[in-house]
Regions:
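Extended recognition/assembly regions associated with phosphoester-bond processing machinery
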Residues: 2-31, 35-230
Length: 230
């Protein structure tokens, strides 16, 4: 799904994966990234929601929200797919138009009012200032034009980030890129891939840890002469 037109094999694999999660009674929240076709990704989203699979493909002028209850009360999950200033401005008058990615994200966040007495989680797919990237990968920021100041997310108890392939925390332990499950370039050969697990109890009591992934076929770098490698 690193493309707006994923292969039939990728679609079938995602379908099988979502079915397995549904059979385990796991709620799923999905958002579109910068490589995705948001309209295609969200096809049938209303039907999927009946199975607790919530897909947000496009920004529609307001943050999508899904609330789940546990023993500590409600957790509000806000979904913000990849946005550009133009995506936000189409819902604004010319006098209200925003400039820059930080302003665009900030405006999108202001479309909802958070209950600070309850737990709030946001899913976002943006390039946060200070992120460490793989320069050979597809997530390079050119000139910092699409950088977003991570402080715009300060009111959220956890910030689940996508876009960057390398797993890492930004600004605080509860703001994290989970990274990709597989390596997409040789620049990631020495990167340990993992799954990020968040243990969220009552408000303010959140623990974050990771479980390493071991691929069936790893990416390795071999340096030698052409003749010796052959």
């Amino acid at each position: 799904y690193d493309t707006g037109n994923p292969s039939s094999e990728a679609v079938a694999l995602l379908s099988m994966f979502l079915l397995e999660l549904k059979n385990l009674d796991i709620h799923v929240m999905m958002i579109a990234g910068n490589h995705d076709n948001g309209t295609r990704l969200s096809y049938g989203a209303e039907i999927f929601a009946d199975s607790d699979i919530y897909i947000t493909g496009k920004y529609t002028g307001k943050l999508a929200c899904t609330t789940i209850e546990d023993e500590y009360g409600p957790i509000h999950f806000f979904s913000l797919p990849y946005i550009r200033p133009i995506y936000v401005n189409q819902y604004l008058d010319e006098t209200e138009a925003v400039e820059g990615y930080t302003a665009a994200v900030k405006h999108a966040l202001q479309t909802v009012e958070l209950n600070q007495q309850e737990r709030n989680v946001i899913l976002s797919h943006q390039f946060i200032t200070g992120t460490v990237t793989d320069e050979q990968g597809s997530e390079v920021s050119v000139g910092g034009t699409d950088n977003v100041d991570g402080n715009v997310f300060r009111d959220f108890d956890y910030v689940a980030l996508g876009h960057i392939h390398r797993p890492q925390t930004i600004l605080r332990d509860t703001m994290r890129y989970c990274g990709t499950p597989l390596k997409y370039s040789i620049g990631e050969a020495n990167t340990t891939k993992s799954v990020t697990i968040i243990d969220m109890k009552e408000k303010g009591n959140t623990t974050v840890y990771t479980v390493d992934l071991k691929p069936l076929h790893d990416v390795v770098v071999i340096k030698d002469t052409f003749a010796n490698i052959l």
